[in-house]
Amino acid sequence: MQLSTTPNLEGFTITEYCGVVTGEAILGANIFRDFFASIRDVVGGRSGAYEKELRKARQIAFKELQEQAEDLGANAIVGIDLDYETVGKDGSMLMVTVSGTAVKVRR
């Protein structure tokens, strides 16, 4: 499946718009793990534990997005937008949302 943040794909013609598709992932934060991660992992302003969780959430959201597009018969998604947000009491959870337009394309 072709994925693009732009409204079209170079070298392809959009033949049909199938609809808007979305993917979401909400991951809870482990307080003790996060505390120790802040001590152990933060080197040069980066936290390996947080980066791993972000990557995991992003993969889940994109998988949902592609599954919805496939269910609509699409072979590409254009106009993809990816957002991150903390939710829950004291920002205890991470939410990743991704959306785009499922389309059928041909060369």
Curated annotation (Swiss-Prot):
<protein>
    <recommendedName>
        <fullName>UPF0145 protein ECA2666</fullName>
    </recommendedName>
</protein>
<dbReference type="Pfam" id="PF01906">
    <property type="entry name" value="YbjQ_1"/>
</dbReference>
<dbReference type="InterPro" id="IPR002765">
    <property type="entry name" value="UPF0145_YbjQ-like"/>
</dbReference>
<comment type="similarity">
    <text>Belongs to the UPF0145 family.</text>
</comment>
<dbReference type="InterPro" id="IPR035439">
    <property type="entry name" value="UPF0145_dom_sf"/>
</dbReference>
